[in-house]
């Protein structure tokens, strides 16, 4: 439990110390944000900061960070180091800068921002790459929840039914103004996720289960360690739990709803 506690403290310290350093590098100011200058009642809508945080939290803490960290834990104490240092120095920095760059560029998505500086060809390549990734991730994010819901209703509603329901929800959430579905439902899901995280944390400190310590060594404890070495498999398994460039596709959604650049660190980092 000592290593686990130190890792938690390191993540908190990383936000306040290194996060503040990155914020000073970017230098947020008091200029008007796209939510105010380009308000359209659909995508560009000012939202409360707490709600933006909840939505962004849910955008980041999806299937990847949760299941990835669980699978990555099989590799032993090395996963502690990758999650902590990867999050502080790579993942959080990337997500913060991606969101702030969008905030500075009229809420544009990354392909459009890239096109400003690297030209039309690069923008089109990034658009194509993003579309492919969105299709792959979208398929997983439809099939995954549908499969879990189908297990809860094995005698009445099958996987196909839940795929249709989840897919329909995604379509409506995409087409309707951001404050109608995403702004109302996402914070509820985020509260549920935070409640579960706090519950697990309390359980760990109440029951004191045996957890590996960093001084026990960094050996690969995966059951199939020969076929699945720490490098590169652990880094791929815990990609979203430490760094994932794909998160940058979500940050512009909330950059279009922020009313101050100074809210960037608590929202994105």
Model regions and ranges:
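Extracellular loop-to-transmembrane helix junctions
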Residues: 2-19, 72-102, 111
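Membrane-water interface regions at transmembrane-helix termini and the short interhelical loops
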Residues: 101, 112, 141-153, 167-189
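Membrane-interface "cap" regions at the ends of multi-pass membrane proteins
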Residues: 10-66, 263
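Hydrophobic, membrane-embedded alpha-helices of multi-pass small-molecule transporters
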Residues: 48-64, 203-209, 219-269
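Small-residue-rich segments of transmembrane alpha-helices in multi-pass membrane proteins
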Residues: 117-118, 124-125, 188-203
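Membrane-interface alpha-helices at helix entry/exit sites of multi-pass transporters
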Residues: 77-83, 112, 116-131, 257-269
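Flexible loop linkers connecting adjacent transmembrane helices
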Residues: 20-45, 69-71, 93-122, 256
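Hydrophobic alpha-helical segments and their helix-loop junctions in multi-pass secondary transporters
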Residues: 138, 142, 146-164, 174, ...
């Amino acid at each position: 439990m000592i290593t686990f506690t130190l890792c938690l403290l390191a993540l908190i310290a990383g936000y306040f110390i290194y996060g503040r350093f990155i914020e000073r590098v970017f230098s947020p100011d008091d200029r008007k944000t796209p939510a105010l200058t380009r308000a359209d009642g659909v995508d560009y809508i000012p939202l409360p900061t707490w709600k933006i945080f909840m939505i962004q939290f849910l955008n980041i803490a999806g299937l990847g960070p949760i299941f990835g960290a669980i699978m990555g834990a099989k590799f032993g104490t090395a996963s502690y180091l990758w999650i902590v240092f990867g999050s502080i120095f790579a993942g959080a920095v990337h997500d913060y800068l991606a969101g702030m760059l969008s905030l500075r560029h009229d809420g544009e998505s990354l392909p459009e921002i890239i096109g400003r500086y690297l030209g039309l060809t690069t923008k089109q390549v990034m658009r194509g790459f993003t579309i492919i990734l969105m299709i792959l991730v979208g398929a997983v994010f439809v099939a995954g929840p549908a499969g879990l819901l189908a297990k809860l209703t094995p005698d009445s509603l099958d996987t196909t039914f839940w795929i249709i329901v989840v897919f329909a929800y995604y379509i409506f959430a995409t087409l309707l103004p951001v404050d109608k579905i995403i702004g109302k439902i996402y914070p509820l899901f985020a509260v549920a996720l935070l409640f579960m995280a706090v519950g697990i944390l309390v359980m760990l400190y109440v029951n004191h289960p045996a957890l590996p310590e960093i001084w026990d060594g960094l050996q690969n404890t995966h059951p199939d360690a020969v076929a699945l070495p720490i490098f590169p498999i652990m880094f791929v398994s815990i990609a979203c739990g430490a760094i994932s460039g794909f998160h940058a596709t979500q940050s512009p959604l909330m950059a279009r709803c922020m009313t101050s650049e100074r809210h960037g660190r608590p929202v994105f980092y």
